[in-house]
């Protein structure tokens, strides 16, 4: 059984876009994350150290993106999911990135899901 931590609409300002002028300055993105993790041990002990600290996740993502740029939000979403698996011990990470670049739409976005590889030590 897996449990899920949900972070909805984390506001990040990152450089992303295919045209260079779009990447010239950080733009507002909303990032939503679902992190699967077994909470049984955390609940048993009522101890954050056995869970995933969602405040630490938010802080890490804010710092991680500083000074970087991406052409595709697809790449950004996959890199965030990989970071959650690698650094926070998520079993599964689903990441949705929304950007507000086309005036005729409310937003454009992508959603990716990545799973930890149980065969990697």
Where are the regions that the model predicts?
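N-terminal, polar/charged subdomain of small-to-medium soluble alpha/beta proteins
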Residues: 1-121
């Amino acid at each position: 059984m897996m449990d899920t931590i949900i972070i909805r609409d984390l506001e990040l300002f990152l450089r992303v876009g295919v045209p260079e002028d779009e990447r010239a300055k950080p733009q507002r993105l909303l990032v939503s994350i679902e992190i699967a993790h077994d909470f049984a041990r955390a609940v048993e002990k009522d101890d954050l150290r056995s869970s995933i600290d969602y405040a630490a996740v938010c802080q890490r993502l804010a710092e991680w993106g500083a000074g970087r740029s991406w052409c595709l939000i697809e790449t950004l979403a996959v890199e965030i999911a990989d970071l959650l698996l690698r650094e926070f011990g998520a079993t599964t990470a689903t990441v949705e990135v929304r950007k507000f670049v086309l005036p005729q739409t409310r937003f454009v976005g992508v959603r990716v899901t990545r799973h930890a590889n149980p065969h990697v030590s």
